[in-house]
Amino acid sequence: MDLPIDHFRLLGVSPSAEPETILRRLETRCDSPPDQGFTHEALLQRADLLRRSADLLTDPSDRAEYEAALLRLSESHPNGTVGLDLPTSSEVAGLILLWEAHGALEAFQLARQGLQPPQAPALGSGREADLTLLAALACSDAALEEQDQRRYESAAQLLIDGIQLQQRMGKLPDQQRLLEDALQALTPFRILDLLSRDLGDQDSHQRGLTLLDEL
């Protein structure tokens, strides 16, 4: 998996951070893993990825080489996204870290992709459980980010996608209910969003009127 995040962001430090700051941050991150119910294996892999990033960023030669690679990439692809190539065994942990680094939308999209054939995990596996949980959490956060930008219909569509995924997986009824409640609470804002659009956007207006009728 090509994870759309660099070592600095994964660890949660500034690109100018000194080694002492990086090591303190590593300790803090390892001591406070997410407590939403991920498997022990996923959290161990998360800690391992954090340590690897810290090792690279505290080694002067490795860090200099990495920073030079980042600079070359920014010069050749100004709008490109830096990525980390992760083995399959670390994918779930990488997505958890991406979600923690405020990459909720990307984490949701990649988790949903990971639950689709042909890469879907074995039924009942820890990987399936972790990806299903992450998809719910990341979907919720991504929808909140859209709400903060007043993109209410976009937030609703994210929640609908998340609910449909949870319905298909059938593993986390409580998380599904939270997404459904969030979608319901969005209804008045969706109506205003859809009805305030340009008059030429008839589809949006009709959708807004339909939601209004359903209130």
Please place each PLM-identified region on the residue numbering.
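TPR-repeat structural position
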Residues: 104, 152, 159, 201-205
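Alpha-helical junction/boundary sensor with strong preference for TPR arrays
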Residues: 33, 73, 118-122, 159, ...
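N-terminal J-domain/J-like co-chaperone modules of DnaJ/Hsp40 proteins
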Residues: 1-38, 49, 53, 64-68, ...
